[in-house]
């Protein structure tokens, strides 16, 4: 499943590191199984992360992204609350995970 890690505490306006990962096969639709049958396409296409009602980071994933994608990015801690991350599959299925932060 998805994981999101941020510092537990930060000062208002402090730049922090947000680290995320999701366990996912990231199948391109090009690989064949042991019987020679094409494995169906199934990959994360979009990632977003919001904090305090603002988009902090977004990314489009393409076929070159390996399984279990990991992202690390910088963001400003604006207020106490959560960093809300969403991964969207090419099927439309969404995975969400949040991490709490206390801002002083």
Name what the model sees in each region.
Residues 100-104:
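Short beta-strand edge segments in extracellular beta-sheet folds
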Residues 2-61, 66:
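Contiguous segments within soluble domain cores/interaction surfaces
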Residues 15, 78-82:
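Extracellular Ig-like/FN3 beta-sandwich strand-entry sites
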Residues 69-73:
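Short strand-edge motifs at loop-to-beta-strand transitions and within beta-strands
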Residues 88-97:
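Short acidic/polar inter-strand loop motif in beta-rich domains
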Residues 81-89:
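Short, aromatic- and glycine-rich surface loops/edge beta-strands on solvent-exposed regions
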